[in-house]
Structure formats: C-alpha cells, structure tokens
Design a protein with these regions (language model features):
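C-terminal helical "tail/cap" subdomain of flavin- and related membrane-associated enzymes
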Residues: 6, 348-428
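Beta1/beta-strand and adjacent pyrophosphate-binding region of the FAD-binding site
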Residues: 14-27
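Conserved N-terminal helical subregion
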Residues: 16-18, 76-84, 89-197, 205-210
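Glycine-rich FAD pyrophosphate-binding loop
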Residues: 24, 38-68
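N-terminal Rossmann-fold NAD(P) dinucleotide-binding loop
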Residues: 30-31
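Conserved FAD/dinucleotide-binding core of flavoprotein oxidoreductases
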Residues: 113, 231-303
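Central beta-strand plus flanking loop segment that forms part of the substrate or channel wall
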Residues: 191-226, 236, 264-268
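FAD/FMN-dependent oxidoreductases across multiple families
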Residues: 270-355, 361
Length: 428
C-alpha cells in the first residue's frame, strides 16, 4: 500500500502540510482541482482511467484542426479562478472572449441582448476549445511538483478508516495497486466508478434529446457575439472561437470560426452527423442571416442528454465532484462553471483546515462544504431545466409568455445586471 503525503515528493518548499488528497478522474475538473490544491500548498495524486499523451511545450503549441473540436464556455468567475492560480495567461491566447449575448426565437418577436458596455464588464466570459484547455491543464499538472499522475488506472475498490481513505486500482499491466490519503475527491464523470462503489444513488432524468457539437465557419466575422436561438429544430447556440492562428481576443482578428451546440430530439442526430450539407442548411434555416452564411462544418459529435444528480456529495472521507455530482443540460452553458465554483470552494476550505492544524478529511467540515454549495447548485439546476422546458414547449400560451419575458428582460434595466451576474458566475 502506498500512502501519499508530501514526503512522497521531495517536499517542495510550497508544501504546507503532510496531509494529501487523491483525485479520481483526470478530466478538466480533476486537473483544475489538483492545480487549485497545489496553489494552496496541498499535495495530490490524480488517478485517471485513460492514458495521457506525452506532451511538451513544443507539441502543445501545435494547432488542432481548424474545424475539429468540442468547446467550453468559461464564465467570468471561472476565468477569475484560473487567474487566481496564475494559469490564465497560458490559457488566454487560445480563448475567445464573449462581448455580447443575443437570445431570440425563430418566427417570434421576442429578443434580448446583453452588451459588455452596458454591464460595464470586460467580457461575459471566454470560449475555449476542449483540446487546448485539456492540454494546457495537463501540462501545468505535469510540471507541478505537488501533483503526481497515475494514468491507465481503473479504480476497483474504495475503503475508509477513521483516519484514511484508500483506493485500489488495476493498471494497464493488470497489476493491482493501492493508494491512501486523507481525502478522496471523485471527479470521474457522470457514470462515476467511485460514487457507484460507495453505493451512492442518483436521481436521473432523460430529456429525450441529444446535443450535436462541432465547429463551423461562417462568411461573417463573429465579432465576439454569442447567439442563443430557439427554433423548431431545437435550441441552437453559436459561440465565437479563436481564428486558426490568431488570438481570439485581438479585435483586429475577429475570427470566422464558431462553436455550435444544437439540441435535437433523440434519434435525429445521425442524419446531421453524416450529411454536412444537411447540417449546414438546417443551421441556416434556424439562424437566418443573423450569424452570416454557414459555409463549412468540421467533424461533429453527439451525445444523449440526461440530468444526473448524486443523492449526496459526501460519504465519510470522500467528496463527489464535477459531473459525478451533477451532470446538467448544456443549453445554458453552466455545467463546467458550476463545477469550477465547487472546486474553488472546497480547495479554500481544505486550505483553511490545514491552517488550523485540522484534518482535511474531517466529515463535519466536508458536510459544511456540501451544505455551502447547495444554494448555487440548486439555482443552476432549476435555471437549466426552466430554459429547457420554457423554450421547447410547443404550447402557444407558453410561447407567448417566453417572448414577452424576453422583451421585458431586454427593456427593464434593473433585471439585466442581475441576470448577467448570475450567468457570469459572480452571484449565487
């Protein structure tokens, strides 16, 4: 059995405690949480099922395919969190800011718009390709002396005592290993192995929808505008992306690449994945000329949409985090940003625990964390479901109500700042 502590590393000068954390799941949330802990001087080991690629600064600088990636909208609060740990300068060159947000419905009079000048903010957030975000986070983790990586490892068991939590995992060489620490944080996705091993149930709701994601090119520059469009074909979101070689935040290089998220009925996605012309023409029909002409699409992917909420997020010395705790509908782009706020709060609480000389796996403190995050989580979950229901329901009365609501939102000055702050993650 391996017990992970700062002593396991050659105790870097910024390590403030011999207590440590195991993070299962090395996606964007797991990688980010490890970096948040390291910034606080807390050591961690990240255990990931898949094998990581060997990357370095030279390989990292190579551009991914011009029209081939999934993307994430980073709220202003998420950007602030990355700024706090000194990582945003690395991320910013591959992120594209959102200066304006437009919401409308095809064939209806409802329309609303948010502008950064009106709200007196630098931007509402940033859009970044998942490939670049993952590479930058992984590179930062690999270079951090307080973070150890174990990849190609499948967790098979979780055990707890009064003072430690232990995971057992199988390696790619079919060798069984164990690892112990003061706390385990499970960031291993919607179908979380750790959550299931602990017997934590979930509340699931199948929306009967699929999300088609991809990157398109238009003949009109995006000008840093994000567009949410509700059409009979389903909700459509088009977000600005960096250009092929340029900096997406350079006003002189407003690009022509846009990220697309299209919510359609389950079963309809196959035809749009296979037929680029059909995909582009249907997008055009849904958007009109608001985004210009859609002239090219990259490889597209699709995944079914199901809301998954863990019955509890703390079990002994284990915290359930990220999509393992709450997998949400992507229509409002809030899922990853909610996870980042969770991670930021927990890292801060663990650091405070260390400064008091107390156990970072103390269940009472972890229960306090779960309670502290409930309000924000419930608000975001309700908002996502309200948008899905409100803008997909065919009832004429509901359609009229949502159009009136859009107009009211656009015309009432006191409401806009409130909604903008919620969307940016600055107010919960």
């Amino acid at each position: 059995m391996t017990e992970l502590t700062c002593k396991s590393f050659s105790k870097p000068s910024n390590c403030i405690t011999d207590q440590s954390v195991i993070i299962t799941g090395g996606g964007h949330v797991g990688l980010s949480f490890a970096l948040l802990l390291a910034d606080k001087g807390i050591a961690s080991t990240l255990v990931e099922r898949n094998s990581y690629p060997n990357i370095g600064p030279e390989q990292d600088a190579k551009r991914t395919h011009y029209l081939d990636s999934r993307n994430t909208a980073l709220s202003r609060r998420t950007v602030q969190i990355y700024q706090e740990i000194g990582l945003w300068d690395e991320l910013q060159s591959h992120a594209c800011r959102i200066d304006s947000v437009q919401v409308s419905e095809q064939g209806s009079f409802g329309y609303a718009q948010l502008n950064k000048e009106e709200e007196k903010v630098e931007s509402f957030g940033q859009v970044m390709e998942n490939a670049w975000l993952g590479r930058k986070l992984l590179l930062a983790v690999q270079q951090n002396p307080l973070i150890s990586l174990v990849d190609g490892a499948v967790v098979t068991q979780v055990e707890q005592t009064a003072t430690t939590a232990t995971i057992t995992y199988d390696t790619e060489e079919q060798q069984q290993q164990t690892l112990s620490a003061d706390l385990v944080v499970a960031c291993d996705g919607r179908d979380s192995t750790v959550r299931n091993l602990l017997g934590i149930g979930t509340q699931e709701y199948d929306y009967g929808q699929s999300a088609i994601v991809g990157v398109v090119q238009t003949d009109k520059p995006h000008e840093h505008v994000a567009i949410e469009r509700f059409s009979p074909a389903g909700p459509l979101a088009v977000l600005p992306l960096t250009d092929a070689e340029g900096d997406g935040n350079n006003a002189q290089q407003a690009g022509y690449r846009r990220s697309v998220v299209w919510i359609c009925k389950r079963g309809e996605e196959a035809q749009y994945l296979e037929d680029e012309a059909l995909f582009l023409s249907t997008l055009q029909q849904g958007f009109g000329q608001r985004a210009g002409k859609f002239i090219k699409a990259g490889r597209r992917g699709a995944y079914p949409l199901t809301r998954v909420l863990a019955d509890k997020q703390v079990e002994g010395r284990v915290v359930i985090m990220g999509n393992a705790a709450h997998t949400l509908h992507p229509v409002a782009g809030q899922g990853f940003n909610l996870c980042m706020r969770d991670a930021h709060v927990l890292a801060k609480m663990l650091a405070n625990q260390v400064m008091r000389g107390e156990d970072i796996g103390d269940n009472r403190m972890l229960q306090d964390y779960e309670q502290a995050r409930k309000k924000d989580q419930k608000r975001v979950i309700r908002f996502c479901d309200a948008v899905v229901l409100g803008f997909t329901h065919p009832n004429p009365a509901i359609k009229l109500a949502r159009n009136v609501a859009l107009i009211a939102f656009d015309k009432l000055p006191n409401i806009k700042p409130l909604v903008a702050n919620y969307a940016m993650g600055l107010k919960s």
